[in-house]
Structure formats: structure tokens, C-alpha cells
Amino acid sequence: MTDGHLFNNILLGGRAGSNPGQFKVYSGGLAWKRQGGGKTIEIEKSDLTSVTWMKVPRAYQLGVRTKDGLFYKFIGFREQDVSSLTNFMQKNMGLSPDEKQLSVSGQNWGGIDINGNMLTFMVGSKQAFEVSLADVSQTQMQGKTDVLLEFHVDDTTGGNEKDSLMDLSFHVPTSNTQFLGDENRTAAQVLWETIMGVADVDSSEEAVVTFEGIAILTPRGRYSVELHLSFLRLQGQANDFKIQYSSIVRLFLLPKSNNPHTFVVVTLDPPIRKGQTLYPHIVIQFETEAVVERNLALTKEVLAEKYKDRLEESYKGLIHEVFTKVLRGLSGAKVTRPGSFRSCQDGYAVKSSLKAEDGLLYPLEKGFFFLPKPPTLILHEEIEFVEFERHGAGGASISSHYFDLLVKLKNDQEHLFRNIQRSEYHNLFNFINGKHLKIMNLGDGQGATGGVTAVLRDTDDDAVDPHLERIKNQAGDEESDEEDEDFVADKDDSGSPTDDSGGEDSDASESGGEKEKLSKKEASSSKPPVKRKPKGRDEEGSDKRKPKKKKDPNAPKRAMTPFMYFSMAERGNMKNNNPDLPTTEIAKKLGEMWQKMTGEEKQPYIQQSQVDKKRYEKESAVYRGAAAMDVDSGSGGNESD
């Protein structure tokens, strides 16, 4: 980059362990973003007070201190990075990094340096270790010469580490010259009072504000929510969670559409843990019209010194607004509200299903959020493409009044949002298209007069839907209808074996209205024999079927999805174990099995699909070259007849 430096695999050090991410330094400041999404740290140049370099095992550490007294440790720089970054900071940011040395002697006596909220134990001029006083929950005297620090034990700390620091004790002899005592106070008491002035040690005694009987959907239950100075506590009948504000990444305030409730989501990094289950999102549900009045248990001095312009003495208003304002003021987390998207009913979300759960999909300015269960946040920058999948693509047994939205991530993970009403198609497509996200399955009609655009302009369900026609043509494979129904009934494989006949996208955009009307008549009548469907279509819609008859037998077979490989492997076992199970139920069972599988269990099928995809790409390249030669010779059409 021209305006700075970019580094990958830089660790953010902290009491909860080290997380890898991407580090960027530029003329306006610096930023760190966790790998795979989550926590982000942005520091403006004007907020920086000091920068230090330290040689640590196998790497260099960059220490950054801010005006708020916070200290960040970025670990993983190479020796050659030190000089280049130092020169860049001196030239563009007006900062000259200092160099610190790490004590490796193992000596456990030395001096204490308190700078901001960081306590550093020094052995001579070298640093032995440092701890953040913001993590201290209690400090007390033990005898006359010992000071004990107890650290917060919350449900997020230690998510990445097996061990966590619980307490630390300092012995301060009466002869200590750094913390001078007198007749009434020993040197240890002077140190204790100094720490008391920095650490939020009183925060565990009394909550700043409490909200009783709050419904939390994830983790489910009714809780008393206490907001303290440095953490929040969720107290329920069966569970008790303590969460440091430093673990809060962002707050989301999302009203339900046509519903008397509003979601407030607290996103965490690291997440809280209950048994083996991790909860990266706390989903709170408030009554939208409920009004509360709360007075904060803070003195005017504390409000003026620590929370100026962030908190007020008292609040009165809607409960979700009061809760969000107070939590934002205490934690410093940003709040995300609904953006420009509006549903067909002027709501902020569309009804859909994820896996086996019904919920709401919120299209936000920088991502999608599915609530309430499982709460799933997808950022736009993580998306490789989205794909609209219309119901009815494999037969008339499923209503065409709904469609599915497949979101494929850059890490090959997929999210399939099902059963979205067709009336939401127009607004959802326009919103996604406006965010410049790649949309698959548009066929050739991406202009203003064809393809999906034509569908979006039609609100009548009987109108011609070129996008649906294209998928129906793909689904009209010449293999057995029974196999097609198996894969269409379960949408987990966003393609099904019908992809074998999907090489005629341009034909779909040219189909007339007679074909769809004919299929609707067939769907409304009693079920005809399977063999009568193509026969009836040939009689009245022969023009529509001609492209199908002209399909080149030399065309390469489409690549199969991981779910298709899984279905092929397990379908026989499913039929043997359940001989009386209908075909559509077998597909449904296979889909449920696929959803419950872990990433490791899916890996063999994913690898098979990737190999098949490469095969298809190679064969397609050869086929396109041969097809171009046939077109030039002008003999392809006569031979097919």
C-alpha cells in the first residue's frame, strides 16, 4: 500500500490469550482486525501518546498507548519491520518509538511502574511483566507489607487459553523507597491506595443500573441484567454470566417488523461459554412500547471525569433505548441500527428460515444478521457471492410464492435462508445489488429489460418469470424424475443433479409466458403420470422444448456439489433402513443429516466437489473452443437434426 504498511498474522496480546489478525499502519493512525471477522481496533494518530518496541521470543512486540490510558500489544513483527515502521511513524505520524528490553533473568524483586491503567514490574531497567489494572476486581492489604490483586474471572476470559491469571501478590518491605510511608501508612498501603485510584475495584459492590426480568433468547432464560463500571452481569435462575466490557465488539438495536418486541444484540469477542457451547451473540428481547426511568448510581464527579458527554445522571424513555444508551456509555461500544433496507411491509427485515429455525433476516448496511436463533452475523466483506433459488424449480409440488437466498462466503462456508416470500424479492434484490455484492444465477438477462430485472418489475404471481423459467429449464434433466425430486425437495445442495442440463442460460431468458402458464395448469390438476408431463409440453410448447432437444451430447457435465456427493453415498443406506419412506422424505432426512454434520465430516465430500469443479472447468474450456470452431464452419445446426 502506498500510504502505509500492512501486516498479516499479527497477534493482539491480552489476558484472554492472543488472537491473530491483520495490522495496518498509515499516516492517520493504525488499525487491527481479527482474522475471520470479529474484534476491530482503530486508533487515530491524535489519540496516540507513546509507541514502544520490545524483543519477545521469536518476534518483536509493538506497544501502543492511548490518551484514554489504554495499552495495546501487537506481536509478530520481524526484525526488518522494526526499522521500516519506525521510519514511517517518525516521518508521517510524528512519533519516535522507544525501545524496551525484556528481563529474562527470573528475578522476582524489583520496582513497580504505574502508567495509565498499566502496572509494570521492572527488574532494573528491564520489564519483567505487566498487567492491566482494568482487569483488577479487588485489591486488599494482607498484613502490613503485602498487597493482593484479584482479577476479574468472567465467562469470556480464557476462551482461547487453558489457564488464566486469578490473583497476584506484592510484598512491599517497610524499607521501600519508591512508595514512601509515614507513621500512619506503610509503604504497602501507599501502593494499595495508588492502585485503588486506578482500578475499578468498587464496581463489583454495586451496579450502576439494573434491569430486572429481562427476556434473553440466547442463552435462553430470564435474567437480571446488572451494568457495572467495567463489566455486565447476567443473573438467572440456572445461569450466571459475567462479561467484561472489553469483550463487547458491537451493539445491535433491531426492531421486529409488525411485532411488539425489539432485539438488542450484544456481540462478543471472545464469546461466553456454557459447557461446550459458545455464545458470540447475546440476543435480548425487549417490549417495544415499555417505558422505564432509571437513575445511575454514579456521583457527579465520576460522571464528569470518566463519562463526560457519554452518560447522564438519569434516563427516561423506551426500555430498549435506555438500556442501549447506558451500555454504550459504559462500554464505549458502537451501536448499529437498521439501514436503508425496507421490506414490502415497510419493515426492517424479511421472514426466513435458517436450518430448522424460523426467524428474521436483517439486511444491514455492512452485513446480514439472522435472528433470533441461531444468531448469525455475515459481513459483506466476507461474502463471495449470493444466489437466488426460486421454489418450484424442480417441479410444481413446491409453491413458487417463496424463494431461498444462498450466501456463499470466501471461506467456502454457505448459509441458506429459506422460505422468503416472493413479494420481498424486489426490495431484497435491489438492496443486494446496490451493495455491489456478486449475484449468481442471473442468466444472460442482466440488463434493464431482461433477466431478474424483468421479474422485479412484475408484482403479479401469474406474470412471466424469466429467472424461474431458467431454473426450471435447468431442472428438466433427462435423468429419472425420482432422482430430481430427491434433490429439489432438500435445498441444502444449491444445485442438485439437474445442473447436468443447465448449460442453456440464454434460452431461459427468451422463454415466453405459455410455458409457465402450462406448468401452472398441470400443477393445479390431479397428478398425471410422470411420462405425460414431457408429452403434454411437446404438444403445446414444442418451441420451448426445441433448445432442450438440441443439447449437445458432448457438452461437459456440470460439477456436483458436496451435498450431492453426500446424498449419493447415503441414499442407498437410507432406503434400506427405511423401505417405506417416500422419496421426498428421504431427501428431507438427508438434508437434516447434512445440516448436523461438522465441517470435518463434510470435508471428504467438499474435496470430491472441488476435484469435480476443476474437471468441469477444464472440460468447459475445451468444449467452448470446439463449439467456436463448429459455429465458424456453420454445420452444427444441421447435424443436430
UniProtKB/Swiss-Prot annotation:
An example Gene Ontology CC term for this record: FACT complex
Primary localisation category: nucleus
Bias type Basic and acidic residues, positions: 512-524
UniProt-listed Gene3D superfamilies: 2.30.29.150, High mobility group box domain (1.10.30.10), Pleckstrin-homology domain (PH domain)/Phosphotyrosine-binding domain (PTB) (2.30.29.30), Structure-specific recognition protein (SSRP1) (2.30.29.220)
Region Disordered: start-end pairs: 459-561
Biased composition (Acidic residues): 476-487
Subcellular location per the Swiss-Prot or TrEMBL entry: Nucleus; Chromosome
Job description of the protein: Component of the FACT complex, a general chromatin factor that acts to reorganize nucleosomes. The FACT complex is involved in multiple processes that require DNA as a template such as mRNA elongation, DNA replication and DNA repair. During transcription elongation the FACT complex acts as a histone chaperone that both destabilizes and restores nucleosomal structure.
Family of this protein: Belongs to the SSRP1 family.
The protein's name: FACT complex subunit SSRP1-A
Organism in which the protein naturally occurs: Oryza sativa subsp. japonica (Rice)
Gene this protein is translated from: SSRP1-A
